[in-house]
Amino acid sequence: MYRVFEALDELSAIVEEARGVPMTAGCVVPRGDVLELIDDIKDAIPGELDDAQDVLDARDSMLQDAKTHADSMVSSATTEAESILNHARTEADRILSDAKAQADRMVSEARQHSERMVADAREEAIRIATAAKREYEASVSRAQAECDRLIENGNISYEKAVQEGIKEQQRLVSQNEVVAAANAESTRLVDTAHAEADRLRGECDIYVDNKLAEFEEFLNGTLRSVGRGRHQLRTAAGTHDYAVR
């Protein structure tokens, strides 16, 4: 290829240095020199073309090798990527399955714990209510018995006072000089009996009211205990409620 360019340069120099033909754009060149240079170019071109073709063939071979290598690398990379992806999917499925199993187990444990707490709280509430009912019935029974006793004692005292007053009145009726005093004493005794009966009834009412107040305080304490138990139950159920969060 170097000889071709060299001959072309020499031809260009001959044309530039040739004597011009007057009144035309032509020139006079040495025919022999020009033909010789043309022959040199003709002789050089086939070899240069062969070299160029060899270069092109080598380039095509290199390109084909590079393409084959690239295709092989792409195929290997694709296969490896698919293998990695399949492994990742399998691992993700396994992790997801393990997480779901663990979540189900935790939810089941939380539900069982909540059910146990609810059952315990229900049993405790029933026990407290039963105890409160027994205490209430016992308190009411004691209060009623005490009230009946006080009323009976009051009635007995009242009847006794009335009978004493009547006897005293009958005794004094026969004595004219003390009739007025007997009447006054009888009235006093009757009034005293009524006052004693009223006092006993008041004490009975106060006793019953005090017993009912004690029972009311016991019931309020029981209700507060039940409320605290329900609050603890709701708090525990919210702490272990895995599935909703």
UniProtKB/Swiss-Prot annotation:
Looking at the record's lineage, which domain of life comes first?
Answer: Bacteria
List the PANTHER family.
Answer: SLR0848 PROTEIN (PTHR38010:SF1)
Protein name (Swiss-Prot/TrEMBL):
Uncharacterized protein Mb2952c
Q: Please name the taxonomic classification of the source.
A: Bacteria, Bacillati, Actinomycetota, Actinomycetes, Mycobacteriales
